[in-house]
Amino acid sequence: MAMRAKDALGRFGEEVASRHLAAGGAAILDRNWRCREGELDLVLRDGADLVFCEVKTRSGTRFGSAAEAVVGRKAARIRRLAARWLAEHPHAPSSVRFDVVLVSRPPVGPVRVEHLRGAF
């Protein structure tokens, strides 16, 4: 997949995830927050929880499921990035959760969204 197509797919997934989470009552605080170590896809408030949400978008299953992409080093990196975000936002809620939203956009059929609360 060309880099531009991959970027467009990622942006599509983040938009779908944002709308899905907002429809469930979450307030988006940050999108694509960046620092020198990397990027957090979504930071949101869900009730009393501060949620760091990784969005994974797939157009098929040949690379494995999206949930399989957020394990080990990737999860550790997201935790480090969350610590950086919290350092810059000292008044954020103290209850923190890490979620993953899986967006599947198959070549045929409807888009599917799966929200894994407390994924890691």
Swiss-Prot record:
Molecular function terms from GO: nucleic acid binding
Domain of life: Bacteria
Signal peptide (from-to): none
InterPro entries tied to this protein: Restrct_endonuc-II-like (IPR011335), tRNA_endonuc-like_dom_sf (IPR011856), UPF0102_YraN-like (IPR003509)
One matching Pfam family: UPF0102
NCBIfam families per UniProt: PRK12497.1-3 (NF009150), PRK12497.3-3 (NF009154), YraN family protein (TIGR00252)
Family the UniProt entry places it in: Belongs to the UPF0102 family.
Protein name: UPF0102 protein FRAAL5785
Annotated source species: Frankia alni (strain DSM 45986 / CECT 9034 / ACN14a)
Organism lineage string: Bacteria, Bacillati, Actinomycetota, Actinomycetes, Frankiales
